[in-house]
């Protein structure tokens, strides 16, 4: 009688054995040193097509790694990356991009004296501003979890019916 639950437990746990093994861990990004050329620039890589700055200040004596913050010489001579324009965009597009702003959804609620903090002296016409949060990620996560649980139950139910049918104990 105990063989069927043990069989279900073993077959159900086989699916998790492969994911429990874990993946291989490669070299950390902090340990990779990008060699710099004479002017401190590295040619673009195949994967990013972006020019990156090399390590110009040498290695840090205490850690043996390249510094992450640009030196004072680099800050004074190079403009920030955000201010550089590409050949594909014109000055008009750049100015238009700077003038656009992102609008947050803000709601206002009036605050009554009854609902305000007792130690605070509030006027009756004061408003409280709050940012409205988007609930879509939470709903999506709950939907995925419920869907996975229903799928496991559905597949388990089919498996139980098939096992009963094979053993001869199933009578519709």
UniProtKB/Swiss-Prot annotation:
Residues 51-63 have a biased composition (Polar residues). It is a single-pass type I membrane protein. Residues 143-147 are annotated as: Requires for dimerization and lipidd rafts association. Residues 164-165 are annotated as: Requires for interaction with MSN and EZR. Changing residue 167 to A: 50% decrease of cell growth. 50% increase of cell migration. Residues 1-22 form the signal peptide. Its main location: membrane. The keyword Signal applies. The keyword Signal applies. Changing residue 171 to D: Does not significantly increase cell motility. Does not significantly decrease cell growth. Keywords: Cell junction, Cell membrane, Cell projection, Cell shape, Developmental protein, Glycoprotein, Membrane, Sialic acid, Signal, Transmembrane, Transmembrane helix. Residues 100-109 have a biased composition (Low complexity). Induction: Down-regulated by treatment with puromycin aminonucleoside. Up-regulated during progression to highly aggressive tumors and during epithelial-mesenchymal transition (EMT). One of its GO terms (cellular component) is leading edge of lamellipodium. Residues 163-172 are cytoplasmic. Pfam families: Podoplanin. It is found in: Membrane; Cell projection, Lamellipodium membrane; Cell projection, Filopodium membrane; Cell projection, Microvillus membrane. Disruption phenotype: Mice die at birth of respiratory failure due to a low number of attenuated type I cells, narrow and irregular air spaces, and defective formation of alveolar saccules. Knockout Pdpn mice neonates are smaller, and approximately 55% died during the first postnatal week. However, approximately 20% survived, had normal weights and life spans, and are fertile. InterPro entries: Podoplanin_domain. The cytoplasmic domain controls FRC elongation but is dispensable for contraction. The cytoplasmic domain is essential for recruitment to invadopodia and ECM degradation. Mediates effects on cell migration and adhesion through its different partners. During development plays a role in blood and lymphatic vessels separation by binding CLEC1B, triggering CLEC1B activation in platelets and leading to platelet activation and/or aggregation. Interaction with CD9, on the contrary, attenuates platelet aggregation and pulmonary metastasis induced by PDPN. Mediates effects on cell migration and adhesion through its different partners. This is Podoplanin. The gene is Pdpn.
């Amino acid at each position: 009688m105990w063989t069927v639950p043990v069989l279900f437990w073993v077959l159900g746990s086989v699916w998790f054995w492969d994911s429990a093994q874990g993946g291989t861990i490669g070299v950390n990004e902090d340990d990779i040193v990008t060699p710099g050329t004479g002017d401190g620039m590295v040619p673009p890589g195949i994967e990013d097509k972006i020019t990156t700055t090399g390590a110009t200040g040498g290695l840090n004596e205490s850690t043996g790694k390249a510094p992450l913050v640009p030196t004072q010489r680099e800050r004074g001579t190079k403009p920030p990356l955000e201010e550089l324009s590409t050949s594909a965009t014109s000055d008009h597009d750049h100015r238009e991009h700077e003038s656009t702003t992102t609008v947050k959804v803000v709601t206002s609620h009036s605050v009554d004296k009854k609902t305000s903090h007792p130690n605070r002296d509030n006027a009756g016409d004061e408003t409280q501003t709050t940012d409205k949060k988007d609930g879509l990620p939470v709903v999506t996560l709950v939907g995925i979890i419920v869907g996975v649980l229903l799928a496991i139950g559905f597949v388990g139910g089919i498996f139980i019916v098939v096992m009963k049918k094979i053993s001869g104990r199933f009578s519709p």
